[in-house]
A protein has these predicted regions:
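Hydrophobic, small-residue-rich membrane helices and short re-entrant helix-turn-helix hairpins
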Residues: 1, 58-92
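Extracellular/periplasmic helix-exit of transmembrane alpha-helices
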Residues: 11-32, 86-143
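Membrane-helix boundary/coupling elements in multi-pass transport proteins
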Residues: 52-71, 130-133, 137, 141, ...
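Transmembrane helix-bundle signature of multi-pass membrane transporters/permeases
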Residues: 50-53, 81-88, 169
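Transmembrane-helix boundary/entry motifs in multi-pass membrane transporters
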Residues: 83, 148-158
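Helix-loop-helix junctions that connect adjacent transmembrane segments
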Residues: 1-56
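A glycine-rich phosphate-binding loop feature that marks nucleotide/adenosyl-phosphate handling sites
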Residues: 84-85, 99-103, 162-169
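Alpha-helical transmembrane segments of multipass membrane proteins
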Residues: 4-7, 56, 87-95, 175
């Protein structure tokens, strides 16, 4: 919970380093790219994306054996499912922000060169092929979110470790 609050603070205030110099935090992703090379059609994925929050809220309610045992009656399930859905949507917005603004603060490419701004975005998302695969998606989130935490004077190695633990925790709770 504290890590998520830190990401929210970094998103709204842009972080503040110990030396008083604030990093330039800007969204470097293009607003619209209607035809990325090699991308599948958007139509079926759009409905899956929109339904994901509602499904996750319902899944949070019924998939955990503890939640169903804690509600007094069926009407208590409505605010729990809705709250889980809203929380899931908020988390999705934080992840998007970390991947589009956090990457711009700097990433290291395969050759070891430090990239910032649009060059960092292009390194990760230049084509559908470079953005594909679970490893590149997790790396984009970990790098972007750790950059946001590093902007708040948290050492980069600690920020990367925290984000790695966060990703592992999400994976672990998903398997439950």
């Amino acid at each position: 919970g504290l890590i998520v609050l830190g990401l929210v603070a970094a998103a709204f205030w842009g972080g503040a380093s110990l030396d008083g110099v604030r990093p330039s935090l800007e969204i470097i992703a293009p607003a619209v790219d209607l035809s990325p090379p090699g991308a599948p059609l958007m139509l079926p994925f759009l409905f899956i994306t929109i339904a994901c929050g509602a499904i996750s809220g319902f899944h949070c309610l019924v998939a955990s054996g503890t939640t169903s045992k804690q509600v007094r009656n069926e009407t208590d399930a409505l605010p729990i499912g809705y709250g889980a859905m809203v929380t899931e949507g908020f988390l999705a917005v934080l992840v998007i922000f970390a991947c589009v603004a956090g990457l711009g603060l700097g990433v290291t490419d395969a050759s070891g060169e430090e990239l910032t701004g649009v060059a960092a975005w292009s390194d990760r998302y230049a084509s559908w092929g470079t953005a594909g695969g679970l490893g590149s998606k997790v790396a984009a989130f970990v790098d972007g979110a750790s950059n946001l935490l590093a902007a708040m004077a948290i050492p980069p190695s600690v920020a990367i470790a925290l984000m790695g633990v966060l990703v592992a925790s999400f994976a672990g709770t998903t398997l439950d």
